[in-house]
UniProtKB/Swiss-Prot annotation:
Residues that coordinate or bind ATP: S14, I15, G16, K17, G18, I19, D71
Binding site for L-glutamine: G354, L382, G383, M384, Q385, E404, R461
Region (Amidoligase domain): 1-267
Gene this chain is encoded by: pyrG
Native source species: Gloeobacter violaceus (strain ATCC 29082 / PCC 7421)
The protein's name in its UniProt record: CTP synthase
Top EC category: ligase
Length: 549
């Protein structure tokens, strides 16, 4: 029988429910249990694909082409398991499904209501994940904060779920925050008490409390929380702020989170194997050197908009016994002050993906600087498209652009994918998900990957215009990767540059702490070589971690 763990949050938003859920997944997998993690998002959007990065952060793309919440990236990175469209459910998708059923007449003329129709649909989505993946444990993160009106249908659904599948098969974990008042020198539990009271008023009594704090909880504080929240002291878990998110599983293991969860679910207690994860965290926290890499983007005011890029850089750095210091550079600021002002003192640069014309000239300027000053460079999606525009303007002397930014440009070096010509809706209609890419032997990309056929995740509507293919090759660029039918250019690179490579896909989505992505490894390695002269490994040396169950 599959077991279910529901993770809710209280007191404040962005409290770290996703990291707690992902950490528990890691701890269970270290004991040999198979796990999948599901995110329930209370917003009415069908998916986050059309949401502003400033409001939502990164849109994480899965192998099957789902545009999902960034927490799914944490799930994949912590558990080393691919997730799918089934692992992200929104209020919008629930209502869309229920309304479609009503229009088809599935409810036989009945009045459609939140209870039972919406709650039943939510429960069905949870069961579907369990049915399709057949894990030992399904961990469900409930988005939002207890007390939010948007979350009520989800909370009612998970309340009912325990009755449906049996109390012994369901566990409720509530993540809360313990405030410290510096002037009083005290830690305050009252917000946590009120949060649990709110949860209990819905009919959910948490089994475990995970208490975020900037310092350890004293025995007295744990006793107080236990007394007022009706949770055993052993189930009051400290989750202290950590130097790196990858240390959280180890901290929660020391606090006994997994032991308590396994006991309450009636599973067999097994000895965890976290030795390799401990090595990983030690290398993250104690690097022998550092390198600075600029991320030149449109959404740098919210670093979560590029969270997978940052994590991919960190994964590569760990494999090289280094730390990456990220320099955030606004593409619009580059337009005002010039690329040199921001890039003169960095060791490498990344131009990530995005949409729209704002800041494009700044990205192009940053790419021109990187090319001309031999600065290690990696372009991602829009970053590749801007690399082509930069070449066309400054090497070929063309008044070039993308038709996304200028539909009337005389030299459309980037143009709309043919299959996108008649697309009207924006949501879920791009080229999405995992697609094959064939690499040219002898190229930098081929050396880094070490294989000829690779699969990468995509999210784009525009592509390199093949009418300019011959010209870009004559100008010195190599097309080192393309779709197997040779129609879509996937990777371009410069052979006479220390490291200049750009991709139409998003390699950051496939990077893992123990398996850095080859292209990010290559960038960080080139940046280190620029900074120092010592010999470095020639290929990514994965940090060993327990294999996926």
């Amino acid at each position: 029988m599959t077991k279910y763990v529901f993770v809710t949050g209280g007191v404040v938003s962005s409290i770290g429910k996703g990291i707690v859920a992902a950490s528990l997944g890691r701890l269970l997998k270290s004991r040999g249990y198979s796990v999948t993690i599901l995110k329930l998002d209370p917003y009415i959007n069908v998916d986050p694909g059309t949401m502003s990065p400033f409001q939502h952060g990164e849109v994480f793309v899965t192998n099957d082409g789902a545009e999902t919440d960034l927490d799914l990236g944490h799930y994949e990175r912590f558990t080393d398991t691919d997730v799918s469209k089934l692992n992200n459910v929104t209020t919008g998708s629930i209502y869309q499904s229920v309304i479609n059923k009503e229009r088809r007449g599935d409810y036989m003329g009945g009045t459609v209501q939140v209870i039972p129709h919406i709650t039943n649909e939510i429960k069905e989505r949870i069961r579907r994940v369990a049915h399709d993946t057949n894990p030992d444990v399904v961990i469900v993160e409930v988005g939002g904060t207890v007390g939010d009106i948007e979350s009520l249908p989800f909370l009612e659904a998970i309340r009912q779920f325990r009755k449906d599948v049996g109390r012994e098969n369901v566990l409720y974990i509530h993540v809360t925050y313990i405030l410290h008042i510096p002037t009083a020198g005290e830690m305050k539990t009252k917000p946590t008490q009120h949060s649990v009271k709110e949860l209990r008023s819905i009919g959910i009594q948490p089994d475990i409390l995970v208490c975020r704090s900037d310092r350890p909880l004293s025995v007295g504080i744990k006793d107080k929380i236990s007394e007022f929240c009706d949770v055993p002291v052993r189930a009051v878990i400290t989750c202290q702020d950590a130097q790196t998110i990858y240390a959280v599983p180890l901290n929660l293991e020391r606090e006994g989170l997994a032991h308590q969860a396994i006991t309450l679910l009636g599973l067999e207690q097994r000895q965890p194997d976290l030795r390799d994860w401990e090595i990983l965290v030690d290398r993250i926290c104690n690097p022998s050197r550092a390198v600075t890499i600029a991320i030149v983007g449109k959404y740098v005011r919210l670093s979560d908009a590029y969270i997978s890029v940052v994590e991919a850089l960190r994964h590569a750095a760990v494999a090289l016994d280094a730390e990456v210091k990220v320099e955030w550079v606004s593409a619009e600021a580059v337009e005002e002050r010039g690329a040199g002002y921001f890039l003169n003192n960095v060791d490498g640069a990344v131009v990530p993906g995005g949409f729209g014309s704002r800041g494009i000239d700044g990205k192009v300027s940053a790419i021109e600087f990187s090319r001309g000053h031999r600065l290690p460079f990696l372009g991602l999606c829009l970053g590749m498209q801007c690399s082509v525009i930069e070449w066309a303007r400054h090497t070929a002397g063309l008044a070039a652009n993308s038709t996304e930014f200028d539909p009337q440009t005389p030299n459309p070096v980037i143009s709309l994918l043919p299959e996108q010509a008649d697309v009207v809706d924006l949501g879920g209609t791009m080229r999405l998900g995992l697609w094959p890419c064939r690499l040219q032997e002898g190229t930098l990309a081929h050396r880094l990957y070490g294989e000829t056929l690779v699969y990468e995740r995509h999210r784009h509507r525009y592509e390199f215009n093949n009418a300019y293919r011959k010209a870009i090759i004559e100008a010195g660029f190599q097309i080192s990767g393309a779709s197997p039918d040779e129609r879509l250019v996937e990777i371009i690179e410069l052979a006479d540059h220390p490291y200049f490579i750009a991709t139409q896909f998003h390699p950051e989505f496939k990077s893992r702490p123990n398996k850095p992505h080859p292209l990010f490894f290559g960038l960080v390695r080139a940046a280190l070589e620029r900074k120092e002269t010592e010999r470095l490994p020639a290929s990514p040396a994965p940090v060993p971690l327990p294999s996926a169950v």
